[in-house]
């Protein structure tokens, strides 16, 4: 049986400093109210020591001004870490994908750029393989309880439902889907289990559940409904929570997960 994966998320914004703009690790609540909590590279090293299976690095600014900072941050991480890195934020072109892979990314995370230009998924998958392509899908629960896809940091609604967009991504060669509940993000109330439970029957792709973890049991619940991995940012920013402790709880629940290097 394939082992479940535990993935800390490293989301950063840009902060001015006397030495110039620098990346600052932040946590969010429902994709808003960013709170700075440290340095992304330093935190990545801590997560590696705590047995993270992978790391997701995301530039929340996603602009042409922040792009060089994302590349520099990625270079610093890849030079000092052995943990696989999935990287995204503002990717709109194949050239940007190439730059990230050249700097040490193992996978690229496509979001708004893929919705606006779905052919980008085909191009990256055909060039580098499906295993390189993670599609990040941000969703909100609508009044009729359906889930719809939002882009631009959760500020723009699209015409895509979660299931129709997930199927389109799968048909184009995506290798994995990162599903984030905007409603649950940073609340600690638990994952959107219904979406993951239904989606596992819609697409034959590994699913990463994200948004809402506040207890180790929330990770267990995500795995039990079909997630191959659970990603979290705010949860691991708490002093009494880390990937090593969390995976022990997951193993005690009877789920297969790595416990040592």
Swiss-Prot record:
Example GO molecular function: imidazoleglycerol-phosphate synthase activity
Disulphide-bridged cysteine pairs: none
Key word Amino-acid biosynthesis present: yes
Catalytic activity, EC: 4.3.2.10
SUPFAM superfamilies on file: Ribulose-phoshate binding barrel
GO cellular component, one term: cytoplasm
Chemical reaction(s) catalysed: 5-[(5-phospho-1-deoxy-D-ribulos-1-ylimino)methylamino]-1-(5-phospho-beta-D-ribosyl)imidazole-4-carboxamide + L-glutamine = D-erythro-1-(imidazol-4-yl)glycerol 3-phosphate + 5-amino-1-(5-phospho-beta-D-ribosyl)imidazole-4-carboxamide + L-glutamate + H(+)
Listed InterPro entries: Aldolase_TIM (IPR013785), His_biosynth (IPR006062), HisF (IPR004651), IGPS_HisA/HisF (IPR050064), RibuloseP-bd_barrel (IPR011060)
Active site: 138
GO BP terms, alphabetized: L-histidine biosynthetic process
Pathway: Amino-acid biosynthesis; L-histidine biosynthesis; L-histidine from 5-phospho-alpha-D-ribose 1-diphosphate: step 5/9
Group of enzyme by EC: lyase
Record keywords, A-Z: Amino-acid biosynthesis, Cytoplasm, Histidine biosynthesis, Lyase
Cell compartments where the protein resides: Cytoplasm
Function, in words: IGPS catalyzes the conversion of PRFAR and glutamine to IGP, AICAR and glutamate. The HisF subunit catalyzes the cyclization activity that produces IGP and AICAR from PRFAR using the ammonia provided by the HisH subunit.
Protein family (similarity comment): Belongs to the HisA/HisF family.
Oligomer status and interactors: Heterodimer of HisH and HisF.
Name under which the protein is recorded: Putative imidazole glycerol phosphate synthase subunit hisF2
Organism of this sequence: Prochlorococcus marinus (strain MIT 9313)
């Amino acid at each position: 049986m394939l082992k479940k994966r535990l993935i800390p998320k490293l989301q950063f914004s840009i902060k001015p400093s006397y030495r110039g703009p620098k990346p600052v690790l932040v946590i969010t609540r429902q994709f808003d109210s960013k709170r700075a909590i440290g340095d992304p590279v330093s935190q990545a090293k801590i997560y590696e020591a705590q047995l993270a299976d992978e790391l997701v690095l995301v530039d929340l600014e996603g602009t042409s001004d922040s792009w060089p900072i994302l590349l520099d941050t990625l270079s610093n991480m890849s030079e000092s870490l052995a943990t696989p890195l999935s990287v995204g934020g503002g990717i709109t072109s194949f050239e940007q994908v190439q730059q990230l892979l050249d700097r040490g990314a193992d996978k690229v995370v496509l979001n708004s750029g893929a919705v606006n230009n779905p052919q980008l998924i085909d191009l990256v998958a055909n060039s580098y393989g499906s295993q390189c392509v993670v599609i990040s899908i941000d969703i909100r629960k609508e009044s009729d309880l359906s889930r719809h896809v939002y882009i631009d940091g959760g500020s723009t609604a699209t015409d895509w439902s979660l299931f129709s967009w997930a199927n389109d991504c799968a048909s184009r060669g995506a290798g994995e889907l990162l599903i984030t509940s905007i409603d649950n993000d940073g609340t600690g109330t638990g994952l959107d289990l219904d979406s993951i439970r239904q989606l596992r029957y819609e697409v034959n792709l590994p699913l990463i559940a994200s948004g809402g973890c506040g207890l180790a049991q929330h990770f267990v619940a995500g795995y039990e409904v079909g997630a191959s991995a659970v990603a979290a940012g705010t949860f691991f920013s708490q002093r009494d929570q880390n990937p090593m402790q969390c995976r022990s709880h997951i193993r005690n629940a009877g789920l297969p997960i790595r416990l040592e290097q």
